[in-house]
UniProtKB/Swiss-Prot annotation:
This is U-scoloptoxin(04)-Er1f. The lineage of its organism: Eukaryota, Metazoa, Ecdysozoa, Arthropoda, Myriapoda. Its main location: secreted. Coiled coil: none annotated. Belongs to the scoloptoxin-04 family. Contains 2 disulfide bonds. Residues 1-14 form the signal peptide. Keywords: Disulfide bond, Secreted, Signal, Toxin. The keyword Transmembrane helix does not apply. GO terms for cellular component: extracellular region.
Amino acid sequence: LLVCLFVCWNAVGAQDARSAFSSEETAQDQHVMEERIFINPCRKPGKNACMENCRSSPNCKTMSFVQSSIRP
């Protein structure tokens, strides 16, 4: 639960940082907002809901991959 939220939330932070330097800032911001909307349910207590949502969300999978690529 915490791992999924941590990875997804950090990925959104990284996306925020990149969007500031992106020529596609509007598109980036829209994607960030979609990611935040996806994350909201993960804040609620739940056994496997967060991990299941994380695995089933294409956005989260993509952002998790990007985050792992950023950090060595």
